[in-house]
């Protein structure tokens, strides 16, 4: 007992110092039993009674606690049991037992080596109810044997320091309503400082705005999936889930909730947006301040209300400022050309805060009293359109001549229809010029005699101005207009005398205004005898029937004669009966099965040629979207063509400008007549023409990438050599087709090649194949015409000798343009210098990185003797071989192997000729690189001469094109220093 007392006293002193190091209990542990928290005696069952003893002590807060100890180390065969009271399981599936104890080292106790132990045993028993003091050892199941990590000795007793051990054991699963714990001593000197029994749970938490309740793990083998619920004012974006582990930890968060519109995430809640702020959509976004000209007055707003006279269009996002309609357009200017007018105006001063401004044109036809106006005829045309204009100009055509019009130009934006104020428009009134009148429709015979006839007629339906007089043209029918007489009449009647008796005369009448004569009326025939009648008019159908019957009789007679002759066996030739016959029409001999180009200029009437080779389109099937440029004859527009039962396609539309001359009309229709004869994938395709309404239009397929030269300059050094050769092959194939048809283009250049989105090149611009008067690339020759000398062969420049061989020369220039990515041939040399240099045998230099085979093809195309140039058929064959053998395109001509008769390549600029880096870069058209080189170590010409491709990348020259030009120029400098300058 003395030993017991010493242990108790020392334990009471020691627990204080050891307990202060304890950490707080984790939040995921739920205590079922904690001996330290029990007030008063624990009341556990000790068996036998002289075994475990309950003693008192204090914790680190000097709070009394009850503990048990045993130290019967002197006696053999100890079997001392200590059982706790019945502990309810609650919701636990697995429990943990935490023991805090001290244990004495047996070696520190004399004379106990055979009886002292340094372990004790832990047991448990499940039950559905409390058994009271009843205790049966065999009902308990052993959990584990507990050993101390540290034991105390006699020296520790002297220092009054005891070493506290903590052991935790896991028990489970437990299924009954409660359980007991038991401690078996078999001869140790041990003190149970505290016993804590607990289970683990995943505590309530909020994750991704989802609440997860307290969750107890089910067993030790699997995770428990828990479905979360969204916090207030939020909704599921993805179903929120987490997994509760056996250690009471939440794992693997999946899904989330997001705050509703009008609320934002603040910590673990969704908080309403305060006044002046809004949130339009559910999600993670924060509340945003109301945009200009809008506000909110309450919490939780999903959008902001616009101020008075400000609006938000249906498709405007809530983040967009409220806007208002624009003010009226300004500075309207009209430019009248006969029966058309071009209207120009300035943008409104106030756009209302929007960019989607469009303009509508309201057309009114007014009498001479301006207040009496009515809507314009639907025949009036607006180019590009009447409504929804995005540019500040429109062309109005097909107006009536000598008529008052008022045009109101509305400025409209996306909120105009929401506003109540009146329309915002600017108005301009015009009077169209007088024009030639429409034809006289009917001529009436009033009276006649043997030598005279009196005629009358009505004023033209559309006088288009003030009628000044009428021109009466007449001739004897039998003369067939070889000899005719013209007289003028002031009014709508005339008496013609001095006629031959009993003779039929043909009459035509046309009216004249200040703008000129109108079209002649149709022909009317009258006989100057008292019984004559009009062949045109009511009796015309009788005459036509009689003529038709006579023709039929003649044809029948001829056919019968031929058949009888054949039946009788008479032959005028020995040719077989199935001999192909040749047909003559329009002055051209046509061979069956052979397609040959027909020059439309040989037709007397260009309309006849265009109708023979081109399809007439209905203007209502064409929609013009926008004007994209101006051509030789008028504007060039993009638009859409929708033919019945066919898919809508994009097209390019050329219009004939208002006030055209007859020559311009012939040339315009001539271009369509030329294109209409071609059918090849590398020739621009003609969709049709519009000639029966104004404006006259040529409609072709639409090429998205525009002209080849501009396209290549825009995409400098961005294509492989194979891609470039593919483009060149397409051009050569199209030119072979033209050459086979006997057509000479005369103006083959990269600017006249169009390229579509699939990089297919097509030859175009046939309107300049005859006349090039307006071409900026043209130069005067000795014959007085204009030709594009930079692309034209020497014989064509000197003698106007255009052939397929001269087109081959031009193709060589196009080849050079393609390989140099749209460089201007001969750069800034004057046209006269170009002619002189070519005549002296100089040729364009090798483009940078150009394969040797392609440059040789260029030189072949530039043979001075046209008979030595390749045919287009040969060019196509050469390019096909190169495409099939791409390795041959990797051979680059060295500087030493180049011909000596080359012009100086201006892409390789001599650094020595410039004083500054900027001058040198300007010379290579890489001035945009000047800022990059300014201030770096390569700011002088001497240092730049040593630069490499990697160095250029470091300073910011990352585009391949400028890199190649600079490196090529440096290499040229090295070559010139070794071999001398290249001749010019």
Swiss-Prot record:
Residues 1-20 form the signal peptide. Residues 912-976 form the SAM domain. Residues 21-541 are extracellular. A motif (PDZ-binding) lies at residues 982-984. Most abundant in the heart, brain and lung. The modification Phosphotyrosine is found at residues 597, 603, 702, 780, 938. The active site is at 747 (proton acceptor). Glycans are attached at residues 232, 337, 391, 404, 493. This is Ephrin type-A receptor 3. It comes from Rattus norvegicus. The gene is Epha3.
